[in-house]
């Protein structure tokens, strides 16, 4: 599934290709998505390419080919506004309540365990305060919990201050996953996980913040992001 920003960029590129026969420039993409820097566009394009939605053609400037578009159900949901919303795994599909619910859409109570920093790491609160209800098929298998996002270091990934991050408990992660990382058993942060040689990189999605490079013995994975819960 695509994040909202990824979907908006894919739609913008596809519409420009249909209208003009050439893809938009990075500056045009940045302005269309209201991003502050072109580095955010680079990350979005890389994510779209990794997911098989676009292909960058070698040795040609501004050469981007749209290979496929999201399913109609996701495209329609990304265009609607509502309260509250749930954004599915990797922040793609948005669902609203419907008159008839099948088993996968029936709400599941997810405990809210505290706050998580999307910025400078803060202490992760581990006391269950309340629950939020999300459709069962948004979570998948495993044990899940929610953390309230504080900070703006992941805005280019579509994660905003005040969002509820839906987390699947997990002690391992693949490169590129957005994870809850516990640093030195004291501070927790929400960042993109990558391996760099023998080290671990915790990457923000905001150029105002720096990548943190840490040895593995200082980082514990507490879970992987599978979705967002947002009220408008």
From Swiss-Prot:
Homodimer. One of its GO terms (biological process) is DNA repair. Its EC number is 3.4.21.88. The gene is lexA. NCBIfam families: lexA. Keywords: Autocatalytic cleavage, DNA damage, DNA repair, DNA replication, DNA-binding, Hydrolase, Repressor, SOS response, Transcription, Transcription regulation. The record marks 118-119 as: Cleavage. It comes from Bradyrhizobium sp. (strain BTAi1 / ATCC BAA-1182). The keyword Methyltransferase does not apply. This is LexA repressor. GO terms for molecular function: DNA binding; serine-type endopeptidase activity. Belongs to the peptidase S24 family. Represses a number of genes involved in the response to DNA damage (SOS response), including recA and lexA. In the presence of single-stranded DNA, RecA interacts with LexA causing an autocatalytic cleavage which disrupts the DNA-binding part of LexA, leading to derepression of the SOS regulon and eventually DNA repair. It catalyses: Hydrolysis of Ala-|-Gly bond in repressor LexA. The active site is at 153 (for autocatalytic cleavage activity), 191 (for autocatalytic cleavage activity). InterPro entries: LexA (IPR006200), LexA-like (IPR039418), LexA/Signal_pep-like_sf (IPR036286), LexA_DNA-bd_dom (IPR006199), LexA_repressor (IPR050077), Peptidase_S24_LexA (IPR006197), Peptidase_S24_S26A/B/C (IPR015927), WH-like_DNA-bd_sf (IPR036388). Pfam families: LexA_DNA_bind, Peptidase_S24.
């Amino acid at each position: 599934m695509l994040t909202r920003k990824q979907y908006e960029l894919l739609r913008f590129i596809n519409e420009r290709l249909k209208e003009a026969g050439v893809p938009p420039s990075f500056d045009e993409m940045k302005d269309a998505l209201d991003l502050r820097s072109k580095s955010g566009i680079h990350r979005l394009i890389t994510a779209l390419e990794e997911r098989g939605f676009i292909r960058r053609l070698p040795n040609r400037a501004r050469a981007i080919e749209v290979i496929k578009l999201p399913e109609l159900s996701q495209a329609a949901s990304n265009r609607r506004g509502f309260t509250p919303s749930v954004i599915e795994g990797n922040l793609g599909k948005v669902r609203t309540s419907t008159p008839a619910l099948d088993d996968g859409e029936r709400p599941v109570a997810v405990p809210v365990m505290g706050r998580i920093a999307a910025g400078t790491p803060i202490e992760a609160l581990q006391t269950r305060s309340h629950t939020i209800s999300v459709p069962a098929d948004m979570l998948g298998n495993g044990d899940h919990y929610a953390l309230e996002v504080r900070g703006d270091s992941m805005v280019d990934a579509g994660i905003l201050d005040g969002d509820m991050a839906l987390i699947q408990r997990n002690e391992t992660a693949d490169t590129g996953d957005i994870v809850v990382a516990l640093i030195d058993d004291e501070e927790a942060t929400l960042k993109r996980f990558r391996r760099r040689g023998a080290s671990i990189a915790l990457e923000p999605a905001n150029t105002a913040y720096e990548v943190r490079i840490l040895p593995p013995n200082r980082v514990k994975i507490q879970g992987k992001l599978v979705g967002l819960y947002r009220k408008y």
